[in-house]
Amino acid sequence: MKPVIALVGRPNVGKSTLFNRLTRSRDALVADLPGLTRDRHYGEGRMGERPFLVIDTGGFEPVAKEGIMHEMAKQTKQAVAEADVVIFIVDGRQGLTPHDKTITDFLRKSGRSVMLVVNKAEGMKYTMVTADFYELGLGDPYVISAAHGDGVSDLVEESLDIAFAQRPPEEEVPESKDRSIRLAIVGRPNVGKSTLVNTLLGEERVIAFDLPGTTRDSIEIPFEREGKLYTLIDTAGIRRRGKVFEAIEKFSVVKTLQSISEANVVLLLLDAQQDISEQDAHIAGFILESGRALVVGVNKWDGLTSDRRDEIKIDLERKLGFLSFAKTHFVSALKSSGIGPMMKSVDNAYAAAMSNLSTPKLTRALIEAVEHQQPRRKGSIRPKLRYAHQGGMNPPIVVIHGNALDAIDANYKRFLEKHFRETFSLVGTPLRIELRSGKNPFSRSEK
């Protein structure tokens, strides 16, 4: 499980600046939740070999009772509940404010690990910029400049150390799970995720209802279907209570992102009775960016008129056309209709994502592609593609070597991707193409 860091503080203390630095400006990978003026943003960062999720919150008024500030406070409280570590940011130039004290009182009651961070400390001595903030009783403050990056690496390293130290040791995964397909079912609330889980498990092991609270605990449910082993990764907030699993249809962005990152295959479930939303597209975008194999399921298909079915298909093509590599199935989780073929596509997507592609076959496919259509010249230079090899799995990565490959445009790269897909039957998985140019023997070099 990736640790979760929440950035909290009053308005304009530098939360978004720090967020953009931690995520290298890839903010809002799964963008704003609907219906709110200012929502929390989620992004993914990495420190060395340690990935993490980071939440950027709006300005925080813990005691706000109504209006925009009340909604923002709710969002921030949810972010704190989802976090392993809270980075509480204050403004070193403005000094301590009553607002900072109010936020401190809330954070102390939350039970979360809190790191006090003094931002905007450029050119100021540590003792001078931190003196006021000891009054908050949160220990020695960390001093950073989010704008310039000073002190940020040390801050993140320390926060990750805290996050990992307070987590229970992970249990050893049984050998049977190692051979299973790790499946995450994701989607907006009430699209039928828990009903589909019930159908897949073949018994009423999951109870679907809304519960308050968070969905921070990760669980895995092993199951077998037609002789194949799967491990269902919690996405809808499935929690163990005694021997029963409860599915909380309370949408958790953190849970969704973590589940996607831990899966071999992601099943994106949509609701045929509703139009495809911006939130659906954002989730799909994150799945694509994560490189996970994908199957799309359109649930509640039974009982729809032919006109409505046509509308949905047009909507799919228009809003989720970038998922054309994935199989789409029209199903009814409640009536178990279409589930078998959909799970077959899960198997096929997994097989495609884990394909072992030999260098001779990849190179032969590359030569065939170039013979069919050569890349365009860029000025007087025509790129030369010489050979290809596999650079990774899940998703498959095809590394192409040659000369002047930086002259290849996006259209030709898409052509190559399509050719490799068709040649190797890579359905249901993203495919990455990497271009590596050798040195041009005719270019000038330093003697």
UniProtKB/Swiss-Prot annotation:
Keyword match NADP: no
Signal peptide span: none
Highest taxon above the source species: Bacteria
Key words, A-Z: GTP-binding, Nucleotide-binding, Repeat, Ribosome biogenesis
InterPro entries: AAA+_ATPase, G_ENGA, GTP-bd, GTPase_Der, KH_dom-like, KH_dom-like_a/b, P-loop_NTPase, Small_GTP-bd
GO biological process entries: ribosome biogenesis
Residues covered by the EngA-type G domain: 3-167, 181-354
GO terms assigned for molecular function: ATP hydrolysis activity; GTP binding; ribosome binding
Positions of GTP 2 binding: 187-194, 234-238, 299-302
Xref: PROSITE patterns: G_ENGA
UniProt xrefs under SMART domains: AAA
Residue numbers binding GTP 1: 9-16, 56-60, 119-122
Residues annotated as domain KH-like: 355-439
Family that this chain belongs to: Belongs to the TRAFAC class TrmE-Era-EngA-EngB-Septin-like GTPase superfamily. EngA (Der) GTPase family.
Subunit structure: Associates with the 50S ribosomal subunit.
Protein purpose: GTPase that plays an essential role in the late steps of ribosome biogenesis.
Name the record gives this protein: GTPase Der
Species in which this protein is naturally found: Herminiimonas arsenicoxydans
Name of the gene: der
